[in-house]
Amino acid sequence: MAIRTFSLKLIILLCMAGQVSASETMITNRSDFENLVVEKKLKRFLISLSVTSEGKIKGEAAGRNVTGDWDWIDGFFCRTILWGKRELKYNCQKVTFDGKRLRFISDRGKGNSASFAIR
C-alpha cells in the first residue's frame, strides 16, 4: 500500500512539473526579449544585471563586477561575460518567460538554467 501511495504522489508531482514548464513561453526574437528587459534589472540571489539594447551586459554578482556583450542569434540569447577577472565562455541560451521570471537555459536549451526576476 505504501508503494502505491508513493507512486501516485510521484505521478502527481511529475504531472505538476510538466504543467509548470508548459506555462513558460519561449522568447524567440530580439524585440520581445528587449521589451522584457531593457531599462530593467534581472535579479536573483547575489546577482543584479542590466541588459541594454546596444548589446551590453553590466551589473554585479557575488560582489564582483559583471560586464559582457550579447546578441540574438537564430532564436537564442548569445553572450560573453566577464565576472570580475574571470571570463565565462561564449554561450547561446534558450530564454523562457513565465509572466514573472526569465529563465536562461545554457547550451541552446540543453544545459543548466538560471531564473531571474525582472524588476
Where does each model-flagged region fall?
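Bacterial N-terminal signal peptides that target proteins for export
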Residues: 1-10
